[in-house]
C-alpha cells in the first residue's frame, strides 16, 4: 500500500492561500476603482479610496502593470487601465458587444468598398485593432489584430478623437505629443483640430498616408446606446487604389455603416 506523505507543516498552506486571495481581491478592487474613475487615477487616490496602505497599493499596481492590466503615465504619474484587461475580456467582446453586432456590417462594407475593414477601440492614448474583415483583392493592407495605432495619425484613431471636446483633445495631445510618422502626418495642433472638426461635420475622417506611406484609411465613430463613442470602423487600402477621388463616396459608405452599427447597439436617431 502506497503511503501519501504531505510536505510542510499542517496548516502552513492555509495562511499563504488566504494572503494570496486577499492580494487578488485587492487587485480586483483597484481595477474596479479605475473603471469607476473613468479609467485612470493617482496612486494616492486609489490608496485613500480603498483604504489601503500607500506602499501596498503601489506594490499591487506594479504587479498589475507586469501583466499589462494597468500602465503608468510617464508625465503625470497617474495609473490607467491597460490592454491586458481587454485581452482577458475578449471572450465577452466576441460573445456580445461591438464585434458581435458589427460582424455582418463589416462583411457588407468589405464587399461594397472592396477594401479591408477594421474595427478599433481606444486604449489610453492609442487605438487598438480588435476586428478585421480582409478584402478579396490580391493587393490588400492588413495589420494584425492587437496592433496599436496613434490616435492623431491613423484613420481609426482620428475617428475615436473627433467626437471629443476640444479640451479633451488638447489634453490627449499634451500627454502624447504629435509624433511625425510620414511627411503628411498632422503635427500642428491647430491643423489637427481643424481636420477633426471637419471630420465631425462630415461624419468620417481620412488618413491620407499619415501613419504609413502608401496606405490610405477612411474611418467613422461607432456609438453605444448612451451616445458614447465605443469604437471606430475603417477601411484601408493602398493609396494607388483608395485614391482621393474616392474619398467622398467611400467616406459616406463608412459613415453609413457606422450609423447602422450604432443603431444596432441601441443608439436612437436624433429627434427632428
Curated annotation (Swiss-Prot):
Residues 21-83 form the HTH iclR-type domain. Residues 98-267 form the IclR-ED domain. InterPro entries: GAF-like_dom_sf, HTH_MetabolicPath_Reg, Tscrpt_reg_IclR_C, Tscrpt_reg_IclR_N, WH-like_DNA-bd_sf, WH_DNA-bd_sf. Residues 1-20 are annotated as: Disordered. Transmembrane segments: none annotated. GO terms for molecular function: DNA binding; DNA-binding transcription factor activity. Glyoxylate binds at residues 154-156, 207, 217, 234-236. One of its GO terms (biological process) is negative regulation of DNA-templated transcription. Disulfide bonds: none annotated. It comes from the Bacteria. Residues 43-62 bind DNA. Keywords: DNA-binding, Repressor, Transcription, Transcription regulation. Negative regulator of allantoin and glyoxylate utilization operons. Binds to the gcl promoter and to the allS-allA intergenic region. PANTHER family: HELIX-TURN-HELIX TRANSCRIPTIONAL REGULATOR, ICLR FAMILY, HTH-TYPE TRANSCRIPTIONAL REPRESSOR ALLR. This is HTH-type transcriptional repressor AllR. It comes from Salmonella typhi.
Amino acid at each position: 500500500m502506497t503511503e501519501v506523505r504531505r510536505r510542510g507543516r499542517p496548516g502552513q498552506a492555509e495562511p499563504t492561500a488566504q494572503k494570496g486571495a486577499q492580494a487578488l481581491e485587492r487587485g480586483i478592487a483597484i481595477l474596479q476603482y479605475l473603471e469607476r474613475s473613468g479609467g485612470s487615477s493617482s496612486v494616492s487616490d486609489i490608496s485613500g479610496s480603498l483604504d489601503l496602505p500607500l506602499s501596498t497599493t503601489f506594490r499591487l499596481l506594479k504587479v498589475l502593470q507586469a501583466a499589462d492590466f494597468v500602465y503608468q503615465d510617464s508625465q503625470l504619474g497617474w495609473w490607467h487601465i491597460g490592454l491586458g484587461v481587454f485581452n482577458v475580456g475578449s471572450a465577452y467582446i466576441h460573445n456580445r458587444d461591438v464585434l458581435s453586432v458589427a460582424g455582418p456590417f463589416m462583411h457588407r462594407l468589405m464587399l461594397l468598398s472592396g477594401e479591408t475593414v477594421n474595427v478599433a477601440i481606444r486604449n489610453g492614448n492609442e487605438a487598438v485593432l480588435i476586428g478585421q474583415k480582409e478584402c478579396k483583392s490580391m493587393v490588400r493592407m492588413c495589420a494584425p489584430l492587437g496592433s496599436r495605432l496613434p490616435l492623431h495619425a491613423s484613420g481609426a484613431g482620428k475617428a475615436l478623437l473627433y467626437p471629443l471636446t476640444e479640451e479633451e483633445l488638447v489634453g490627449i495631445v499634451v500627454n502624447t505629443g504629435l509624433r511625425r510618422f510620414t511627411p503628411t502626418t498632422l503635427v500642428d495642433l491647430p491643423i489637427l483640430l481643424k481636420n477633426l472638426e471637419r471630420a465631425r461635420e462630415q461624419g468620417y475622417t481620412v488618413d491620407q498616408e499619415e501613419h504609413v506611406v502608401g496606405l490610405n484609411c477612411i474611418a467613422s465613430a461607432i456609438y453605444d446606446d448612451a451616445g458614447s463613442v465605443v469604437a471606430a470602423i475603417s477601411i484601408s487600402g493602398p493609396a494607388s487604389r483608395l485614391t482621393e477621388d474616392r474619398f467622398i463616396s467611400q467616406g459616406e459608405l463608412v459613415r453609413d455603416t457606422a450609423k447602422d452599427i450604432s443603431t444596432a447597439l441601441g443608439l436612437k436617431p436624433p429627434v427632428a
